[in-house]
From Swiss-Prot:
Ribosomal protein keyword on record: yes
One GO cellular component term: ribosome
Leader sequence residues: none
Function: One of two assembly initiator proteins, it binds directly to the 5'-end of the 23S rRNA, where it nucleates assembly of the 50S subunit. One of the proteins that surrounds the polypeptide exit tunnel on the outside of the subunit.
Similarity annotation: Belongs to the universal ribosomal protein uL24 family.
The protein, known as: Large ribosomal subunit protein uL24
This protein's record includes keyword Transcription regulation: no
Keywords on record: Ribonucleoprotein, Ribosomal protein, RNA-binding, rRNA-binding
One Pfam assignment: ribosomal_L24
Subunit structure: Part of the 50S ribosomal subunit.
Gene3D superfamilies to which the protein is assigned, alphabetical: 2.30.30.30
SUPFAM superfamilies: Translation proteins SH3-like domain
GO terms, biological process: translation
Length: 102
């Protein structure tokens, strides 16, 4: 997967199109990511020791990784991601600007 936790991304399709956020968690096997503040759902929580009152809580649901694009760190615009080998290490590169991402 070309996305990592902490990356700034923009949603490019779906009901949250145009929203930006950082990736909180990635699920590589399912090709899904959780983006902060995007794809909010309401979850009905039963009372438990951690939450004695229970109730309805807002949380983010995972979205498909193909529905988000990484933001180029230099231009803050969505870009595709490529890979290059530099000094024997594989690094991510922004296709628009050609700059290294990590």
């Amino acid at each position: 997967m070309f996305l990592k936790t902490g990356d700034k991304v923009r949603v490019i399709t779906g009901k949250d199109k145009g929203q930006e956020g950082t990736i909180k968690k990635t699920f590589a096997k399912e090709n899904r990511v959780i983006v902060e503040g995007v794809n909010k759902i309401k979850k009905h929580q039963k009372p438990s020791n951690m939450n004695p009152n229970g109730g309805i809580i807002d949380t983010e649901a995972p979205i498909n990784a193909s529905n988000v694009m990484l933001l180029d760190p230099s231009t803050n615009e969505p870009t595709r991601v490529g890979f290059e080998v530099v000094d024997g290490k594989k690094v991510r590169v922004a296709k628009k600007s050609g700059k290294q991402i990590d």
